[in-house]
């Protein structure tokens, strides 16, 4: 009887630990999703504005509307700097998505472990 009780305690602890980990990961996923969605929306808005500004800059350059080469170079450098910051934000978002996907895989792995634990307790599964 003591072996059965010890076995039950061990399995019960593992179930609870898996559930605790799943809850932590699920909460983290919800937070990450909100952050990613917000970052992507802002990035897309900023990219749209940036692309419009680049298009306007190129149009002014083709029409020779800059008062000097220095004015052209200053505005071009400012646009390049903004483009580089946008590229960095894109890389940050990609890293956030990668972390999110890794957490999804951890949650799926916990689900598979929980299923194996359930199957090991199901006497009919052991016979199959």
Regions found by a protein language model. Name each.
Residues 1-22, 26, 72-128:
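C-terminal amphipathic alpha-helix
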Residues 28, 35-78:
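Extended alpha-helical coiled-coil "stalk/arm" regions
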């Amino acid at each position: 009887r003591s072996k059965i009780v010890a076995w039950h305690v061990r399995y019960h602890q593992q179930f609870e630990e898996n559930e605790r980990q799943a809850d932590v990961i699920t909460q983290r996923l919800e937070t990450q999703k909100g952050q990613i969605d917000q970052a992507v929306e802002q990035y897309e808005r900023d990219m749209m504005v940036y692309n419009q500004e680049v298009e306007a800059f190129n149009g002014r350059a083709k029409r020779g509307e800059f008062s000097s080469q220095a004015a052209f170079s200053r505005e071009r450098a400012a646009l390049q700097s903004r483009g580089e910051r946008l590229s960095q934000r894109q890389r940050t978002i990609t890293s956030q998505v990668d972390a999110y996907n890794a957490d999804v895989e951890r949650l799926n792995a916990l689900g598979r472990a929980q299923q194996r634990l359930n199957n090991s307790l199901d006497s009919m599964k052991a016979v199959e």
